[in-house]
Amino acid sequence: MKKIKLQELKDSEILEQLEEARKVLRNSRFQYGVARSLENPKIISNTKKKIAKLLTIQRERQLKANPGERKSRVFSRAKRKKKNLARLSAKAKG
């Protein structure tokens, strides 16, 4: 499916598509790894791309619903970095 069509899906439909794609990926990897009976190995990479698209759409909707969430993630990352630098400089002194 194209990304435009995927964006038109409801949240529940995205979850269903995601679950279905993960099942297909699991079965394809099994067939390719164990039995070597997979007719088209490209199915694996295409399915992984579809899962990535679905997860991206899901995350975009999550950020639209909570616009402040992204800022808090960036802030906490900077805060951790500052804390780690302080800890490393304290080790170097002591």
Swiss-Prot record:
Gene3D superfamilies: 1.10.287.310
GO biological process: translation
UniProt organism field: Leptospira interrogans serogroup Icterohaemorrhagiae serovar Lai (strain 56601)
Protein name (Swiss-Prot/TrEMBL): Large ribosomal subunit protein uL29
Family the entry assigns: Belongs to the universal ribosomal protein uL29 family.
GO molecular function, one term: structural constituent of ribosome
Upper lineage: Bacteria, Pseudomonadati, Spirochaetota, Spirochaetia, Leptospirales
Gene Ontology cellular component list: cytosolic large ribosomal subunit
Keyword line: Ribonucleoprotein, Ribosomal protein
